[in-house]
Amino acid sequence: AGYTMWDGPYGIGGSRKYLISSLDQSLKRLGLDYVDIFYHHCMTPDTELKETALALSDITRQGKAIYVGMSNYNGKKMHRMYHRCDDLNVPFIINQNRYSIFDRTVEKNDLKKEAKSKKKGLIAFSPLAQGQLTDKLAGGIVENSRLYNNEVLQKKVGYSEGRQAQIAQLYKMAKDRGQTLSQLAIEWLLQWGGVTSVLIGVHSKAQLLENLKALECKPLSKSEIMQINAIAGK
């Protein structure tokens, strides 16, 4: 919860009214009494973290959610929210942030380090960088891909000729290891440390099964991890 639900006051962000109304409507649509994890996704500067934490406290005390998680927080904000939740006995257990070989924001803003120090989980979403880390793009953008004829998205995810060269190098590395590029990207996340799980989006059962094979691939060596980081310029 956190993104725009309706026009007008309290239609976005982390206010008590927004978060409680958002979950109530979701539970009604799902036909459920509660959810296992309720995420707060989008912070707004005009809502204090204390108010958001109080709303999450109400939600868990009422039994509408068993646990809560934070998404798109940076390290500093996560640190503050951790203490707010701890003071209110809110079961905050997980963070959900964009993280991939190409996107290291959670390292730069200290979210990953803060989550580890507080012993909170980290779920990585967009692990394939909007489809860039797949065999499909090894030779360049193809029709029916997310990036095809979409300059806005290309700019947003950092796609360029230089990025394409990086993709080609990573693809070759994956092929030499006997795996797909997506498997390499997922394996890197899980082995890099501090990542609890990876959130993947697929269009078919075949894609899901292919990505799950990342769990069966041989572990990356330290030199291979260094090679991946060097290719990505990180």
Language model regions located:
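A short, mixed-charge helix-start or loop-turn motif at secondary-structure junctions
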Residues: 5-8, 38, 151-156
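Active-site groove signature of glycoside hydrolases
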Residues: 27-46
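Active-site mouth loops of central-metabolism enzymes
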Residues: 3-20, 41-47
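Short, small-residue-rich loop/turn micro-motifs
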Residues: 1-3, 34, 126, 202
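Beta/alpha (TIM)-barrel catalytic core signal, keyed to glycine-rich beta->alpha loops juxtaposed to Asp/Glu
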Residues: 43-233
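A short, structured active-site edge motif that brings together acidic residues
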Residues: 1-7, 96-99
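Short, acidic/polar
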Residues: 12-30, 78-82
